[in-house]
Amino acid sequence: MEQRKVHGMNRRLGLAGLLGASGLVLSGCTVAPPDNGFFHALRMGWPQGITPEAQELGNFWVWVWVAAWIIGIIMWTLMFVVIFRDSDKARKRRGDNEEFPRQTGYNVPLELGLTTLPVLIIMVLFFFNVPVQDKATALDKDPKVTVDVTGFQWNWKFGYGEINSELMPNNQNYDGVDEQAQKLAEDSQYELREGQEVGPIHGKSAEDYSYLNFNKIETVGSTEEIPILVLPSKTAIEFNLASSDVVHSFWVPEFLFKRDVFPHPEQNRSERRFQVEEINEEGAFVGRCAEMCGTYHAMMNFEVRVVSPEDFTRYIDYRQKHPEAPNSEALEAIGVDPYAVTTSPFVTDRQGTRDESSDINRNSQN
């Protein structure tokens, strides 16, 4: 009887230790993990975040893995202890000649503990998960730049909706809406015949593009050139997303965050906006479509080019003064690579392949 009491106390202490260790580890979810190889391996391929939101998401991911490993090691240890402790050989060595090991079924305290403990661990996990998620999806910043993103099969269009005066060459707030193009889009929403709305969608046209944004400064991708979205560092930015056809997804891996890009986002009950507090690293970062959207989905890439606020002002100045110039000229004017360096365009021309195949066939016949 005394031995059973000791075993019961050990179980309780073990469970309490497990809960305490898990809580202690998870309590550090917002703290950056040590910068060493072990913690880098725990990122499981996640890149280092370049926004405060991404850094918190990355920290949470790593510490959850640490907690999972601690719990896993404890559970595997307990399992192997029981396996070897209650093997026939071990029991005979102890002088236990019973047919079966001592059974612990219907042990109410143990069953309650093993039911309560996982629930508590999940509660702790959610306690730290919710603030990180809220930070990533919050729309509480004061964005200095608003970027209008339009996805289409199979490329991207980027435009600047608003830019704060701090980043403008004339020190005045910039409203980038192309009024003429916007009016044409708004006029497209209704099909009228003899003064009646005859569109197939509650009177609206199937070619309704009134929900899209059209800007004076835009960059449009093509099969020859990857679209480059130029953004300032150390600046709050808002992204306003919409698709002109099917569902896409705007994903920059270093943001550790993606958001689906819907046609008619309001009607689809989709949040079309997200914000970042700042981008704290300059450089080139690849962006991708993360939603299967058709034949060339895998080639629907873009590049985010993060420059200093001063270079961003120079870039906007060049785009305003040379509205017909390609984006590559504006990039070259501020002294950076004019074309994408993180990804390449997918050439859809098959003529070269056909010619090569013909040569191979002719050679084989000879």
Segments (PLM) and residue ranges:
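Central hydrophobic cores of alpha-helical transmembrane segments in multi-pass inner-membrane proteins
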Residues: I74-R85
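Hydrophobic alpha-helical segments
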Residues: E2-M75
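Non-transmembrane, membrane-proximal soluble domains of secreted or membrane proteins
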Residues: T30-F60, I83-N366
